[in-house]
């Protein structure tokens, strides 16, 4: 998966309620060509930047795992990214 494909997924689900693998609700948006995530629990948008998203994709393309823990060292938003790529 490429970064452009990840952005296309984020655009497709922008504003739609999604759930993490543990059932926690969130929405996805895009700001300055970078996905950001808003957990229902806090209501505050969060992103750790494009470089973290690219690191996630690099690892995802290598291992193909949908377990957020496999990406904990590359992004704090792994639980959100795995939901997006699972819907590709």
Label the model's feature ranges.
Residues 1-88:
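Intrinsically disordered, charged low-complexity linkers and terminal tails
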